[in-house]
Amino acid sequence: YNPLRRPELVTERRNVVFQQMYRNDMITKDERDSLSLLPLNIDYSPESHREGLATYFRAYLQEFMNKWLRDNPKPDGSRYNLYSDGLRIYTTIDSRLQSLAEESMNEHLKNLQSEFFSQNKESEENPTPPFKDLREGQVDTLIKLSAMRSERWRKMKLNGKNEDEIWATFQVDTPMKVFSWSGEIDTIMKPIDSIRYYKFHLRASMMSMEPQTGHVKVWVGGYNYKHFQYDQVKQGRRQIGSTFKPFLYATAIDQLKLSPCYTVPDALYCIEPMKHGNMNAWCPKNSSDRYGQTRNLKNALANSINTISARLMDQVGPKPVVTLMKKMGINSYLPEVPSIALGTPDISLYEMVGAYSTFVNKGIYIEPIFITRIEDKNGVPLFEVIPETTDVLSEEAAYVTVNLMEGVTKYGSGGRLRHSGLEETNYIYKNLITGYPYAFENAIAGKTGTTQNQSDGWFMGMVPNLVTGVWVGGEDRAVHFDDIAFGQGATMALPIWGQFMKKAYLNPELGISKEDFPVPEIVSIPLDCENLNIESSEKKKDLEELGF
């Protein structure tokens, strides 16, 4: 008795009820007759993707399904109706984890945005907020380009308005509702001013995946689909900063059998001109601009030491690193030049989570899966997903890379995940590290990432059965914090991961692992750096031959 598919049957059934009411003296004959003549007047529209849980995922799912419906007609050749044909679509999203992820993102972004507003007031030193290092003319151009991509502009263009007419409407005070973290605001504002207002707002995305199955458990493309419809999980591509480095280290481990314990001098290092596709010499500096220590590879990755990344890139070359990343599902453009070691390529969060899952899944890449099957109304399967896998790394090389990344959360840039609260007097810890202290004691591998000028903050966090990536940044690269203490991945993105995992561990039914990462049966590469004297071993000679 679906009123959308069988209105005549439903009308007949309704009139039977009216007849029974008349027979039982509940209504008069005239009332029965008049009610029976009324149409159903079904007030129905499909649920909006603008509100509720997993709005960005539902919008992406609808896009996927629309394409699937075009390519997969009914047996009679007609097209399935997504809303009225009773299709059963089974997705991999865990609503409980999804809810925790959205809560965690909202809690942290609210704190972070408040700080960003306070640091971006217009002044003589900051004449074009929220844009850093842009002149007024450049800002005007950027704003106009954004206006031309807006829904308002598109609709007026379709209605035959010319550019001057459309642009004039952007200068007129207009009633509108705008987003704020304290709730939607009814206001009057010029559309051109609303664009700049929204540019002030930092954006974010988050995705979680079960590495052994490829099942996507969390998909958060942003924090308010009504006002920010661009999905930063799959559509957005941003520079990934130091989250690139595990791919470089994994290539070196796989090709050269390097141990996390190998010691390397932290000194300025140059790749000479005309080598590895370079036209000029490439001599990256450390973000701290400090040098002089001797570090093992585990410490170097934990602290994102650029000079040691340059040494590794010189030894393996960019091409093998790019080849590895493409096998791990990264289809974004990757130039084969040494500077990619610092994370200059633009890559989506979707690609990054899939790629990082390879490390936890014994070196096997599984393409992320968000639908397992589609059935018709009778339960007949119409579509079932067969996971696509690729052998990328040996199980040993994958495990050693995970072991390296465990150092990031033990004594590196992700170490605040281990803190128990001793830093509470610090302004940033007290006000911006949402959910702090986390005091995690279980095995966690991860990597922070921060791009040039703090335009992007990343954190990739892994436990044995869940890989999660978080990105935070402005819509435009010119929108960023000035101070790296505020704009680094450990401040912008890591707290979302920490808060999310903290909440997830409170519910044992979710089954999120607190165990150690499984160790392969054979591990020939030394991992116990405290009890291994590399300097007195034959490995020192091997390293010298490799240029270390």
Predicted regions, residues:
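Mid-domain, small-residue-enriched loop/turn segments at the edges of structured enzyme/sensor domains
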Residues: N278-K285, V316-G354, G363
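Second-shell loop/turn segments in exported
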Residues: Y1-E8, V17-F18, Y22, I42-G52, ...
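Non-catalytic, structured segments within soluble enzyme domains
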Residues: Y1-K155, L312, K326-K327, N331-Y333, ...
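Conserved catalytic neighborhood of penicillin-recognizing serine enzymes
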Residues: S45-F57, L258-K319, Y365, E375-E406
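A penicillin-recognizing enzyme superfamily signal
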Residues: T91, S95-N111, T141-E210, H215, ...
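Active-site rim segments in enzyme catalytic domains, especially the processed small/beta chain
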Residues: D231, Q235-H276, Y411, K502
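A generic secondary-structure signal for well-formed alpha-helical elements
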Residues: V17-T28, M65, L69, H108-F116, ...
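Extracytoplasmic/secreted proteins, especially bacterial periplasmic and envelope-associated proteins
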Residues: L9-Q20, S34, G52, Y56, ...
